[in-house]
């Protein structure tokens, strides 16, 4: 052998801990929240995470001599305390660009959250943030169309869009499902939506649902003079069936389809996003299963990472939480997610949980969707939090109206337009929301009844996944 080779086991920190390293613009950067096993030093635990997620195995191997290990290895380059948690620490890791296939989210995350999450050296591990360098961003497809193209397609400007998830989510016949879609769209909504687990069950096969929904859309468009849509869920057992359903949605004239991007898999979702771009179809993305991955504040993947990877994979809409509704979502963190979905360049901001600058270049933005336990009383806060480029999706907050679906839709439309008008006049809609809605209800009996129905309904539970204390 030309080089000497020393077999055996070495501490990871001898090779992968480098506190003097300055990250390069081309590096993929990651920050992990690490809880090491008792007796494992922080530097060793950080280096172990770095090693297992890049080039190492448990022992030295002679084939290390056949490559430039110093070039390809990851480097754990910094450690920080986690405020308010004596057991955990943040480990910052830099990965060289040569480790990853261009444009492959699957490849990147197979390394970053692969075997390392079962590593015995750590008790718990959470991927808090990832900085994707511009070279990597430009090799990814991104959203099929983006916000501006969607507005142009639908001829809707100057306000958020309104949607509704049809309830009950399971059990309706296709004909009754289509009836609910028609009533909601006729009442003033822009979109209605399949729920995440509506696929092709015995009570409502997918083709029947698609046809009745499209009939409802066309009838509502004729009566209102507005462009309407229904998120037809093409999620299916295999990719061939996903394409078959998507093609049928296109044939009947639907402007938008949807998928459950975590349960169908990232490679499948990326393929569907490419199909949508090629076929002029908007793509709504549901995040079903995300709570399994992101809700535990000590183990898993933070949703800000899932939001970033969805923008890279491709999607025109993504559920982002509401802050004010029934689902998990810290306000500061949610605003950080929304910026990552919509802005061209997002600066590091620890107060919102953003550990790195994130450049997006010219990649199209994603429309955040606020959905889950919201009703007319939430409208002022939703507008203040999300602004115009968002979809506010009221399921029970539409279909639960005492006068029916159309009245629920009308109440939401009147509430939204009243808040937008007040905002445009310079009023503080969040602070003055009650007065704004009360005034609007004087000329809208539908809104008045909705306000009376949900006056006492609140979801005041503490957030489980909070930003770490001093960053708030």
Swiss-Prot record:
SUPFAM superfamilies for this protein: RuBisCo, C-terminal domain, RuBisCO, large subunit, small (N-terminal) domain
Keyword RNA-binding: no
Modified residues (N6-carboxylysine): 193
InterPro entries in the record: RuBisCO (IPR033966), RuBisCo_large_chain_AS (IPR020878), RuBisCO_lsu_C (IPR000685), RuBisCO_lsu_C_sf (IPR036376), RuBisCO_lsu_fd_N (IPR017443), RuBisCO_lsu_N_sf (IPR036422), RuBisCO_lsuI (IPR020888)
One Gene Ontology term from the biological process aspect of the record: reductive pentose-phosphate cycle
Site (Transition state stabilizer): 326
Cofactors: Mg(2+)
Membrane-spanning ranges: none
Cofactor binding mode and count: Binds 1 Mg(2+) ion per subunit.
Keywords recorded for this protein, A-Z: Calvin cycle, Carbon dioxide fixation, Lyase, Magnesium, Metal-binding, Monooxygenase, Oxidoreductase, Photosynthesis
Active site: 167, 286
Binding residues annotated for substrate, in chain numbering: 115, 165, 169, 287, 319, 371
Enzyme class: lyase
One GO molecular-function entry: monooxygenase activity
Chain positions recorded as Mg(2+) binding sites: 193, 195-196
Catalytic activity: 2 (2R)-3-phosphoglycerate + 2 H(+) = D-ribulose 1,5-bisphosphate + CO2 + H2O; D-ribulose 1,5-bisphosphate + O2 = 2-phosphoglycolate + (2R)-3-phosphoglycerate + 2 H(+)
Function statement: RuBisCO catalyzes two reactions: the carboxylation of D-ribulose 1,5-bisphosphate, the primary event in carbon dioxide fixation, as well as the oxidative fragmentation of the pentose substrate. Both reactions occur simultaneously and in competition at the same active site.
HAMAP family with a match to the protein in the record: RuBisCO_L_type1
Family indicated by similarity: Belongs to the RuBisCO large chain family. Type I subfamily.
Note: The basic functional RuBisCO is composed of a large chain homodimer in a 'head-to-tail' conformation. In form I RuBisCO this homodimer is arranged in a barrel-like tetramer with the small subunits forming a tetrameric 'cap' on each end of the 'barrel'.
Subunit structure: Heterohexadecamer of 8 large chains and 8 small chains.
Protein name: Ribulose bisphosphate carboxylase large chain 1
Organism: Rhodopseudomonas palustris (strain BisB5)
Source species taxonomy: Bacteria, Pseudomonadati, Pseudomonadota, Alphaproteobacteria, Hyphomicrobiales
């Amino acid at each position: 052998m030309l080089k000497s080779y020393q077999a055996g086991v070495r501490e990871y920190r001898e090779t992968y801990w480098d506190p003097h390293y300055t990250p390069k613009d081309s590096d993929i950067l990651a920050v992990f929240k690490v809880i090491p096993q008792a007796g494992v030093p922080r530097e060793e635990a950080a280096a172990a995470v770095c090693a297992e997620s890049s080039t190492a195995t448990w022992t030295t191997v002679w084939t290390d001599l056949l490559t430039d290990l110093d070039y390809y290895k990851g480097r754990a380059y910094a450690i920080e305390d986690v405020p308010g948690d004596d057991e955990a620490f943040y480990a910052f890791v830099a990965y060289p660009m040569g480790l990853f296939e261009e444009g492959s989210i699957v490849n990147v995350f197979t390394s970053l959250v692969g075997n390392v999450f079962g590593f015995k050296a750590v008790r718990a591990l959470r991927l808090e943030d990832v900085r994707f360098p511009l070279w990597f961003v430009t090799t990814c497809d991104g959203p099929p169309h983006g916000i501006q193209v969607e507005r142009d397609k639908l001829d809707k400007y100057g306000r958020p869009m309104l949607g509704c998830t049809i309830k009950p989510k399971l059990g309706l016949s296709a004909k009754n499902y289509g009836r609910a879609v028609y009533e909601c769209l006729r009442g003033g909504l822009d979109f209605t939506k399949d729920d995440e687990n509506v696929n092709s069950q015995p009570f409502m096969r997918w083709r029947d649902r698609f046809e009745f929904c499209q009939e409802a859309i066309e009838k509502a468009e004729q009566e209102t003079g507005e462009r309407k849509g229904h998120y037809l869920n093409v999620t299916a057992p295999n990719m061939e069936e996903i394409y078959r359903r998507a093609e049928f949605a296109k044939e009947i004239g639907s402007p938008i389809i949807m998928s459950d991007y975590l349960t169908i898999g990232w490679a499948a979702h990326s393929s569907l996003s490419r199909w949508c771009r090629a076929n002029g179809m908007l793509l709504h993305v549901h995040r079903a299963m995300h709570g399994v991955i992101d809700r535990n504040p000590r183990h898993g993947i933070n949703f800000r990472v899932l939001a970033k990877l969805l923008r890279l994979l491709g999607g025109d809409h993504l559920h982002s939480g509401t802050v004010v509704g029934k689902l998990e979502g810290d306000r500061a963190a949610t605003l950080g997610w929304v910026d990552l979905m919509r802005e061209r360049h997002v600066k590091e901001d620890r107060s919102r949980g953003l550990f790195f600058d994130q450049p997006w270049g010219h990649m199209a933005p994603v429309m955040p969707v606020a959905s889950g336990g919201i009703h007319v009383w939430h409208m002022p806060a939703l507008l203040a939090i999300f602004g115009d480029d968002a979809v506010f999706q009221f399921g029970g907050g539409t279909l639960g109206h005492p006068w029916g679906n159309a009245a629920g839709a009308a109440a939401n439309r009147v509430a939204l337009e009243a808040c937008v008008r007040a905002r445009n006049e310079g009023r503080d809609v969040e602070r003055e929301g009650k007065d704004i809605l009360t005034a609007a209800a004087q000329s809208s009996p539908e809104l008045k009844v909705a306000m009376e129905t949900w006056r006492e309904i609140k979801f005041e539970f503490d957030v489980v996944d909070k930003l770490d204390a001093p960053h708030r």
